Amino acid sequence: ANSAAKFHLYPHVEARYKLASDVLMIHAQVSGGMQKNTYKAMTKENPFTGDFVLPGNTNNKLDISGGLNIKLDKEILFSAGASFMRLKDAVYFVNDSTGALNYTTFSTIYSDADVITLKGELVFERNEKFNTHIGATYTNNKPDGLAKAWFVPAVEINLGGYILLREKIIFKTDM
């Protein structure tokens, strides 16, 4: 048995409230959890991860989030949200300068971090046969002991949608 093993207890509280029937809804959540950082998960996130990485766990000590959904009309929905996470031992990728092929692979380091995320999305949906959406996410990731969160995008923009062509034929895209 590992004498360093610790027991963790995490909150999970969620609240939703409709302010104006189906037009405006607000929501909030407080949670946390433990995330396994396996070699398989790290190479899926970054295929250039080197062979000598240390698997570990990221302790999401606290995750507070909230937002609102506004139905602008019967076919258009706008949603916005914000979150704050306090992470212990979050995994970050850095250039591996020790290998034979310097700077062509990445190694991992673990650092505590505070992460603030702001996001918004606009959705257009017509009678369950056509849907399109555009959204943006801004992330302020502040790891301890690192100049910045390397290889973690600060801004992400997504665009996508689907069309139901026939009963069992769906065309779907996400970028």
Model-predicted segments: where are they?
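Exposed, low-structure sequence patches enriched in small/polar residues
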Residues: 6-10, 14-175
